[in-house]
Amino acid sequence: MDQTLIQEILEIVEQAAIASASLSGKGLKDEADALAVDAMRKRMNQIQMQGRIVIGEGERDEAPMLYIGEEVGTGTGPGVDFAVDPCEGTNLCAFNQRGSMAVLAASDRGGLFNAPDFYMKKLAAPPAAKGKVDIRKSATENIKILSECLGLPVDELNIVVMDRARHKDLIAEIRGTGARIQPISDGDVQAAIACGFAGTGTHCLMGIGAAPEGVISAAAMRALGGHFQGQLVYDPAIAQTSEWADMTKEGNLARLAEMGIADPDKVYEAEELACGEHVCFAGSGITDGLLFNGVKFEKDCTRTSSLVISNLDNTCRFTNTVHIKEDAQSIALS
């Protein structure tokens, strides 16, 4: 990857965010997702690269576009693997709630873990706690370590947890330490990345979410120098999801074995989930969130707010872009 490609990757998420935001607040989550997928794919196919979707909208027979294994780009240029979520937080977008964004991770060929469509136990923390907190430790232990690493009393720590029934015991344990719970309804990618930045008020992400989004979070945290670990969850009793109503623990283990995952209980570090030499994360806000604003539609322009994190040059770029409409007459500075 080079700087030109990274700029084009930014444009991919910007276009997806704009498309999805056109339906924000209208209660049409599937339609908003479809618009984002179409816009993301269209921009990808204009880029001189040999792109491949390793995490996308589903298997080939389940998704018409951006399916796993789909080739994108012009077919010439560098080989790039993508993990994409064109509309992360579709419910958030549909009801115009905070935290929806268009996101992707990119790496050189073979540089991203091909995560199954499973759940994943996740732990994200700031760079100061990298390698010190551990997903195998209890929440109580990790909160104590986090307090020491950040120099903050436990009762000032904000721990993000998705508001799900499966987290009832986890939430009780966290509250038992005196730390604060910051519940979110959807969209844990932005919450995980926010842990990597001081001043966001987000100190740690704990709990179970989707595995594909875990890879995207890992790519960002690796490039940022933050802590991220993930462990696949294959037991329906733990995941507590209706999506696995027809699956059993044994059936899920068989699926993992077929995918070549020999140790289903393995704890993956960020550097294993995003192992490429060059790793890039790009996100653009659909609605306002922890890290950036959502899309703003104005008479003469559309404004996007985005973030690109890359280990190519060890940079984080917060970008506000003004997309000028044809026949624009007046563009405000902000």
Swiss-Prot record:
Enzyme superclass (EC): hydrolase
Single GO BP term: glycerol metabolic process
InterPro entries listed in its UniProt record: FBPase_class-2/SBPase
UniProt-listed Gene3D superfamilies: 3.40.190.90, Fructose-1,6-Bisphosphatase, subunit A, domain 1
Keyword Hydrolase: yes
Keywords assigned by UniProt, alphabetized: Calvin cycle, Carbohydrate metabolism, Hydrolase, Manganese, Metal-binding
Cofactor(s) demanded: Mn(2+)
Ranges annotated as spanning the membrane: none
Annotated GO MF terms: fructose 1,6-bisphosphate 1-phosphatase activity; metal ion binding; sedoheptulose-bisphosphatase activity
Residues binding substrate: 88-90, 119, 164-166, 186-188
Domain of life: Bacteria
Keyword Iron set for record: no
Reaction equations catalysed: beta-D-fructose 1,6-bisphosphate + H2O = beta-D-fructose 6-phosphate + phosphate; D-sedoheptulose 1,7-bisphosphate + H2O = D-sedoheptulose 7-phosphate + phosphate
EC number of this enzyme: 3.1.3.11, 3.1.3.37
Pathway linked to the protein: Carbohydrate biosynthesis; Calvin cycle
UniProt binding sites for Mn(2+) 2: 85, 88, 213
Summary of subunit composition and partner proteins: Homotetramer.
Protein family membership: Belongs to the FBPase class 2 family.
Protein purpose: Catalyzes the hydrolysis of fructose 1,6-bisphosphate (Fru 1,6-P2) and sedoheptulose 1,7-bisphosphate (Sed 1,7-P2) to fructose 6-phosphate and sedoheptulose 7-phosphate, respectively.
Protein name: D-fructose 1,6-bisphosphatase class 2/sedoheptulose 1,7-bisphosphatase
Organism from which the protein derives: Synechococcus sp. (strain CC9605)
